[in-house]
Amino acid sequence: MIENPIKRRPTRKIRVGSVYVGGDAPISIQSMTNTETCDVDATVAQIQRCADAGVDIMRVSVPSMEAAEAFGKIRQRVSVPLVADIHFDHRIALAVADYGADCLRINPGNIGSDQKVREVVAAARHHGISIRIGVNAGSLEKDLQKKYGEPTGAALLESAMRHIDILDRLDFHEFKVSVKASNVFLTMDAYRLLSQQIDNPLHLGVTEAGIYRTGTVKSAIALGGLLMEGIGDTMRISLAAEPEDEVKIGFDILKSLGLRSNGINFIACPSCSRQEFNVIKVMQALEERLEDIRTPMDLSVIGCKVNGPGEAKEADIGIVGASPRSLVYRNGEKSHLIDTDQLVDEIEDMVRQRVKEIEEAKSKEIIRSSS
């Protein structure tokens, strides 16, 4: 087993509801609703779908006082920590703090006067909630646009440090920071520069990354690269897609880097003429059937005996394709044969049984350690 070479950057630990961000806390996955916030039922349903996908933190846009009231109703109906996304009107921030927001996403620079910022910080302090400073390349201050000519890593850093200085002067330190851009290199440059200046947790993201496929690729490159350098404490994959898809992709990135496990790590061959069954159809069916599982485990499904045994030995459950019967490996050892035309049903049964065994072992360990 190759040792994971990633060493995370030391950061402060803050809290977003029941979820810790930074320090030794696991890298958390976030998403954001795209429903009308005032449509409480639709927003709650979307948050629940993200919760089912494993999301740690959800962000909800609150553009008006009417939306703030709706936010309060949403807060009562979901258990996932909620970040209220607020711009321009500090009164909305004060309202959602009263309604139970777990974090306020603001730019201190567009909330208004120093007095208004002080009121928002006082409300956050009173309610024990955190703040996220969100800097975006598309909304840089005009003087920085003039100074740098275009969005640059240095420009994003300077904007972030301005906002950080405001909170520092108010002796408020329960905050995380993001410096997002839609360009991969600009995003990475900005976060690298920021990570050298502060020890606050960093919220990673490529803003307006694009539609599902291209946005996934851009996010995987930028955020994966930063994570490999130890930069990042929480992340959102911003896609023109369903929020629950953002969650799944976020976990896939973390799983691929060995930083966090959530559900099944599927290992499958791309298939070729050697395959003894239709690998693509089998994997599509398994992914759909097993998407409810959150217990970490490795499942290897290889269509022939060329690479199948080697991959199977490294997985919790491994399948080596053959006809009419395929070979099953359990925990790296040969186990038994199964009918190849019954693969999907057989694999699902084995996975669910393995999940049961893992969870029972965890429960016994908890009982032993607490006795």
UniProtKB/Swiss-Prot annotation:
GO terms for biological process: isopentenyl diphosphate biosynthetic process, methylerythritol 4-phosphate pathway; terpenoid biosynthetic process. It catalyses: (2E)-4-hydroxy-3-methylbut-2-enyl diphosphate + oxidized [flavodoxin] + H2O + 2 H(+) = 2-C-methyl-D-erythritol 2,4-cyclic diphosphate + reduced [flavodoxin]. Transmembrane segments: none annotated. [4Fe-4S] cluster binds at residues 269, 272, 304, 311. The keyword Metal-binding applies. Pathway: Isoprenoid biosynthesis; isopentenyl diphosphate biosynthesis via DXP pathway; isopentenyl diphosphate from 1-deoxy-D-xylulose 5-phosphate: step 5/6. Keywords: 4Fe-4S, Iron, Iron-sulfur, Isoprene biosynthesis, Metal-binding, Oxidoreductase. The keyword Translocase does not apply. InterPro entries: Dihydropteroate_synth-like_sf (IPR011005), Enolase-like_C_sf (IPR036849), IspG_bac (IPR016425), IspG_bac-typ (IPR004588), NO2/SO3_Rdtase_4Fe4S_sf (IPR045854). Pfam families: GcpE. It comes from the Bacteria. Its cofactor is [4Fe-4S] cluster. Binds 1 [4Fe-4S] cluster. It is an enzyme of class 1 (oxidoreductase). One of its GO terms (molecular function) is iron ion binding. Its EC number is 1.17.7.3. Converts 2C-methyl-D-erythritol 2,4-cyclodiphosphate (ME-2,4cPP) into 1-hydroxy-2-methyl-2-(E)-butenyl 4-diphosphate. Belongs to the IspG family. NCBIfam families: ispG_gcpE, PRK00366.1. This is 4-hydroxy-3-methylbut-2-en-1-yl diphosphate synthase (flavodoxin). It comes from Acinetobacter baylyi (strain ATCC 33305 / BD413 / ADP1). The gene is ispG.
